Amino acid sequence: MSSEKAQNPMRELRIQKLVLNISVGESGDRLTRAAKVLEQLSGQTPVYSKARYTVRQFGIRRNEKIAVHVTVRGPKAEEILERGLKVKEYELRRRNFSETGNFGFGISEHIDLGIKYDPSIGIYGMDFYCCMTRPGERVAKRRRCKSRIGASHRITREETIRWFKQRFDGIVR
């Protein structure tokens, strides 16, 4: 047997999903152009998000479409996350990581991701949010024979930071 202890494959962290969000703050032409940006980036059809409340100072009404987002899973999520982290130079803050082990960050210009600039679309910033999981998480999500995940199997902030540093050779401040 090797000198180091064998790692349990059920304890390995993996990316469950990556959510890309562009919040425009108004419906109309700018929102549809933002949807085109997300479609170019992910290759999937984005979903529109509606405002929950009317806020007169911002000029938005309840149920008005104000944002667009897309959920990416699998190897495509890892590839897009890699491109997003390259823009941030693999450097995140500690407060980017949540207590439940997920993390998120934002970029100011989508053209940094390698998408060619199109004058008819413009430049949009976007938010990346990455949800982490472990094998066996379906036990809590499934419909039949639902059960709880033990405290030792839940993902913590420190575990995700360790995974981020090891996987992407990243810096956490």
UniProtKB/Swiss-Prot annotation:
Gene Ontology MF, one: structural constituent of ribosome
GO cellular component terms given for this protein: ribonucleoprotein complex; ribosome
Keywords: Ribonucleoprotein, Ribosomal protein
Protein name as catalogued: Large ribosomal subunit protein uL5
InterPro entries: Ribosomal_uL5 (IPR002132), Ribosomal_uL5_C (IPR031309), Ribosomal_uL5_CS (IPR020929), Ribosomal_uL5_dom_sf (IPR022803), Ribosomal_uL5_N (IPR031310)
Membrane-spanning segments: none
Family per similarity comment: Belongs to the universal ribosomal protein uL5 family.
Taxonomic lineage from the root: Eukaryota, Fungi, Dikarya, Ascomycota, Pezizomycotina
One Pfam family here: Ribosomal_L5_C
UniProt superkingdom: Eukaryota
Organism: Chaetomium thermophilum (strain DSM 1495 / CBS 144.50 / IMI 039719) (Thermochaetoides thermophila)
